[in-house]
Structure formats: C-alpha cells, structure tokens
Amino acid sequence: MTLRNASLTAVAALTVALAGGAVAQDASTAPGTTAPAGSSYHTNEAAPAAADTAPAAEAADEPAAEEAEAGEAEVTEEPAATETPAEEPAADEPAATEEPDAEAEPAAEEAQATTEEAPAEEPAAEEPAAEEPAEEPAADAPAEEAAAEEAPAEPEAAAEEPAAEEPEATEEEAPAEEAAAEEAPAEEVVEDEAAADHGDAAAQEAGDSHAAAHIEDISFSFEGPFGKFDQHQLQRGLQVYTEVCSACHGLRYVPLRTLADEGGPQLPEDQVRAYAANFDITDPETEEDRPRVPTDHFPTVSGEGMGPDLSLMAKARAGFHGPYGTGLSQLFNGIGGPEYIHAVLTGYDGEEKEEAGAVLYHNAAFAGNWIQMAAPLSDDQVTYEDGTPATVDQMATDVAAFLMWTAEPKMMDRKQVGFVSVIFLIVLAALLYLTNKKLWQPIKHPRKPE
C-alpha cells in the first residue's frame, strides 16, 4: 500500500512540474510574439524544461521512497503484517498517504506561484499548457485515478475515525448514564433509608416519651377491699365538675337522684332538686324545654369541639393496675382509672404547637403526648365551701374520685355485700366440714364390740 501511494505521488508531482515548466517557458517569450501551435519552438523548449523538472521530481521522489521504505520496515516488524497491502490496518493508510503529500505540496505551490506571475494577457501561453496535458493522457489518467483514490481514502479514514470515536463515546456515555441512573436510585434509597431511620427515631422517641410518662399511684380512700368513698371529697369533685368540666363533658349515664344515695355525695333531697333544676331538658311529650328533675340524668354534651362523655371514663382507663393477672393488684390498689385522670389533668407543661389548623398542648400522661384540650385547671379556680385549698393537684384528685363514683356508684354496697358473702361462705364451709366429720366418724372409726 505504501509503495503504490509513493509511485502515484511521484507521477502527480512530475505532471505538476511539467505543467509549471511549460507555463514558465511561455512567460519568458517577448510580448506580442507568438509561435504556431505545432512549431518546433514549443517542442524544443518543452524538452529542456521536462529534462530540468525530471531531476527535481526524482529528487523529490527519493526522500518519499526512503520514507516509504522506512514505513515498510516498521510495518514488516509487526507480526500481524502480511505481504498484501489490503490486509494492513486502515489506520495506517492516512499516515502513509499524508507523508508523500506533504512533500508534493511545495512543488504544487511553486507551480501555482509561477502561474500567478504569468500575465493573463498571453493566450498563446495558455494554449501549449492546454495541449501538453493532452499529449500525455496515460500519465494524467493514473494521476487523476490516484488523486481520486486518495481523495475518497482520506474522507473515508476521517469518517472512520469519528465513527470509531463515536461508539467509544457512546460506550463511555452509556456507562456514565447507567452510573448516573444507578446513583439516582441509590440516592433515593439512601434518602428513603434516612427518612425511615428518622421516622423510626421519631417513633422511638415518642414511644420512649410515652413509656417514660409515669402515672403515680395515688392512695384513694375507696381502694382496697374495705375502702369507701369520702363523702366530702365527692362533693368537692361534683363542684369541680359542675364549674369546670360540665361545659364540654357530659354524664349521660348518671341519674341526678343518685347524688342523694348512701355511698355517694349524699346531698339532701332539696339540694338535689335545686341542683337538677339548673339544667334544662326537652320534654318528649310537650316538646318544650323544662328544668330537670332528680329522675332525669345529667345532660349530654355533644357537638363539634366537645369532649367525650365522662360517665364511665374511670373504668374505661382501667389499665394501670391490670387488668390481666390474678386480680389481686386490682383488689388492693384499684383499677387505675382515677390515677390516669389525675395524671392527665396535672400533666400539662405549658408547651403547645399548631398542627392542621388546630392547637395542640403537650401532656406527658396522654397517649402521643399531644392533646387538643387545653389545661382545664388552675390554682384557686374553684372556691371550696369547706375551705380546702383549691390547688390543681387537689382539684384533680377530687374530680377523679367523683368520676370513679359515677363509674361505680354502687361500689361501697358491692364491697359490703362481698365482705358479708365471704364471711358467710367461711362460716358455711366450717359448718359443712364439722357436719361431714360428725357423719363419717362412726363409719371410719366404728366401735369395737365388747
């Protein structure tokens, strides 16, 4: 491949040199004197010019041939190279063709310089230049073919190089895109893991704060198998409920007449009627509002923003001392509902936040630690008739005891009946044992005959 390119380049350089010599010879003639196209003047002058340019072309061909031989020597040193030029790598063709072309370019530039120096007014000089290429069609044809072959070869090589580079670029871009695509899910996974860890940490903190909220065990008078309600405490609790809690919470399951029952607040009958008259109720027969009577129940408070009914709240929160197990803890310590109510009423620390358009208040005893009910109690909010200091702790204890009574209004009677029943069963068991022993005594230990 290298030898062919070198020979073609030499032929092209020779042709260009001949054309340049002819043009220079025509330019040396005097202006106004022209020779016939077929005269011996042109033939005699063209021969020395050709003879002069031939050594120059040969001198130019010698370095090209030497370089071509050097290139062949380098190619033959490679083990993969063979004698056929077609098997050589396509990447070597541009390098081999460019070296001779670089040497042929100075000759072409010299020829162009001579043509530019020639006057444009000499038509006779142009005619021999046009005739001489026609005289050597055999030499021009290989040169043109070589130029045609070289011209497509270079674009093809140039096209092959970008084409070879483009797959590499696409291959490089593809891993880069894949890496970016992998990094994006990886970042999402990391963010999801971070968000999950943050959520777990928040949930753990919430659980820890809720678990850490200790509900203190208060020694109420009604706890234990022999406990009973404190009448004065129930009356104070009724006062706290009426003045503070009844605005948002009802006692729909508690009849007003039970306020006079033994074991409860034990209010006089006239006070019970006066207390009931403070609440109105719609008469189902006349469909008109009337004052309540002792046979009616406490009002039911319902509507948006109202709290739950407190009739059975002390038993609904009975999880402090059980409820699973043998029941001995509940027997001696109670069910834990009043302690929970007391803890909620005294568990506010003043912290609050706004969420979803609602204001929430931090409460250490409430599930989740945030409650929508504001702190209902404050010191000296209620004035007790018996002169007891109205502290938050005292009012919370009193109303918790009162709500325990509303959930268990017959607790003292139940305990009394239970105590009597247990004593009776103990006595009955003793009598049955003695009776059984008396009946089986003659059979187990018969008398011996005398």
From Swiss-Prot:
GO CC: one term?
A: plasma membrane
Provide the alphabetized UniProt keywords.
Answer: Cell membrane, Electron transport, Heme, Iron, Membrane, Metal-binding, Respiratory chain, Signal, Transmembrane, Transmembrane helix, Transport
Q: Does the keyword RNA-binding apply?
A: no
Asked whether the UniProt record includes Metal-binding among its keywords, one would answer: yes
Instruction: Enumerate the InterPro entries for this protein.
Output: Cyt_c-like_dom, Cyt_c-like_dom_sf, Cyt_c1
* Subunit structure and binding partners: The main subunits of complex b-c1 are: cytochrome b, cytochrome c1 and the Rieske protein.
Residue ranges for the region (Disordered) are: 24-210, 284-305
Entry superkingdom: Bacteria
TM segment ranges: 421-435
Against Pfam families, the record matches this protein to:
Cytochrom_C1 (PF02167)
Name assigned to this protein: Cytochrome c1
Q: Which residues bind heme c?
A: 245, 248-249, 373
Q: Which residues form the signal peptide?
A: 1-21
Membrane topology (UniProt): Single-pass membrane protein
Species this protein is from: Paracoccus denitrificans
Protein function: Component of the ubiquinol-cytochrome c reductase complex (complex III or cytochrome b-c1 complex), which is a respiratory chain that generates an electrochemical potential coupled to ATP synthesis. c1 functions as an electron donor to cytochrome c.
GO molecular function terms listed in the Swiss-Prot or TrEMBL record: electron transfer activity; heme binding; metal ion binding
- Please give the positions of the paired cysteines in each disulfide bond: none
Write out the annotated subcellular location: Cell membrane
Low complexity compositional bias: what residue ranges?
A: 24-58
> Which modifications occur after translation, per UniProt?
Binds 1 heme c group covalently per subunit.
Q: Where is the composition biased (Acidic residues)?
A: 59-77, 85-108, 118-194
